[in-house]
């Protein structure tokens, strides 16, 4: 678990549905703040909008956006089945999307691997919101690097 320092006196929290309606506000995962520099986080949510590796059925590139939109309705305070408050126990932030070249699969694999490797140098875990099955290879390479 992330040890809080004096400068990190409060955990990163989603925007409350009682303050801003769930249909408004940030389009991030679970309405968490978007933080590109994730050094103070335990877990980074990382979008990988890529589907150039698919045949006949493109559209997986819209996955990260769709997951973020659906996650607006998550109730994030307390999970009774696990008796936990996930966003109080871990620092979680949405790190945005990796920019991928939709016209060059090899270049995109390198871009994903480089971004994930750099991010894993700063956080304990990445939760990837993706695209097609191609994204698994560079993510596994990044994990293997660490």
Residue ranges: model-predicted function:
Residues 2-146:
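Metal-dependent C-N hydrolase catalytic cores
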């Amino acid at each position: 678990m992330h040890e809080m320092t004096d400068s990190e006196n409060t955990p990163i929290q989603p925007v409350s549905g009682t303050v801003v309606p769930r249909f408004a506000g940030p389009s991030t995962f679970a309405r968490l703040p978007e933080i590109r520099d994730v050094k103070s986080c335990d877990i980074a949510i990382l979008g990988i909008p890529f589907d150039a590796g698919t045949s006949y059925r493109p559209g997986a590139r819209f996955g990260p956006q769709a997951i973020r939109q659906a996650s607006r309705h998550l109730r994030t305070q307390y999970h009774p089945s696990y008796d936990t408050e996930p966003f109080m126990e871990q620092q979680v932030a949405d790190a945005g999307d990796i920019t991928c070249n939709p016209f060059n699969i090899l270049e995109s694999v390198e871009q994903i691997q480089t971004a994930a490797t750099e991010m894993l140098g700063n956080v304990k875990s990445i939760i990837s919101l993706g695209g097609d099955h191609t994204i698994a290879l560079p993510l596994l390479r990044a994990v293997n690097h660490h």
